[in-house]
């Protein structure tokens, strides 16, 4: 299902959390409320871990990961690395990466099989990505934006891309990723999708400003609650009526 949350009144929750099918990292600090939203939905299935990366709370923008592994920038401290290692399942490989574009979450995005990366990403980083996360890597742009990690979010079920992505680009990306894609927004019209939401194969968290229409699109394209695209129209109608009453 899709749940709304905010971090210290900030709706850009994708900056403060990293969610995969085997673990969830949540920024330290913030209200206990933010952590408990994730804990409530996920704690039965995967570990929810308080963390910071390179002294920053914007962990969602600093790292990239999937069920196989997690890559963090080179300036992550030993203490932070050790804490994350101890908290995640043993099957998850964790690696530091020396990369000029150090906000890895902005320049890369992936599910458990495929990764999209910034066209200028180091060749070595690309190899580490393929090796640690066990993914096929493609250098791509989304709606002519090089920050692929900011403007699209996808799971193994589906994906949401920048609202100005052309139909041709959507088709190309969809065939690379092998999942259905929809162009859309979160947080009442925000184009920076990855900053406003996190998702895995069964659960999504969106910023508090996300409208019920946006939420129903998210639930449908990511196949949460077994929602199918055909149900978008009916659930949208219901949610529009909800928001108008």
Swiss-Prot record:
Q: Report the superkingdom from the record.
A: Eukaryota
Give any single GO term for biological process: miRNA-mediated gene silencing by inhibition of translation
Q: Which SMART domains match?
A: eIF6
Q: Known Gene3D superfamilies for this protein?
A: L-arginine/glycine Amidinotransferase, Chain A
Query: At what positions is Phosphothreonine found?
Result: 165
A cellular-component GO term for this protein: extracellular exosome
- A single MF term (Gene Ontology): ribosomal large subunit binding
Q: In which tissues is it expressed?
A: Expressed at very high levels in colon carcinoma with lower levels in normal colon and ileum and lowest levels in kidney and muscle (at protein level).
Concerning CDD domains, the annotation shows: IF6 (cd00527)
Subcellular location(s) per record: Cytoplasm; Nucleus, Nucleolus
Which residues are modified to Phosphoserine? 166, 174-175, 235, 239, 243
Instruction: Please give the HAMAP family that the UniProt record associates with this protein.
Output: eIF_6
Which PANTHER family does the entry link to?
TRANSLATION INITIATION FACTOR 6
Q: What does this protein do?
A: Binds to the 60S ribosomal subunit and prevents its association with the 40S ribosomal subunit to form the 80S initiation complex in the cytoplasm. Behaves as a stimulatory translation initiation factor downstream insulin/growth factors. Is also involved in ribosome biogenesis. Associates with pre-60S subunits in the nucleus and is involved in its nuclear export. Cytoplasmic release of TIF6 from 60S subunits and nuclear relocalization is promoted by a RACK1 (RACK1)-dependent protein kinase C activity.
The protein depicted here goes by the name Eukaryotic translation initiation factor 6
- Which species is this UniProt entry from? Homo sapiens (Human)
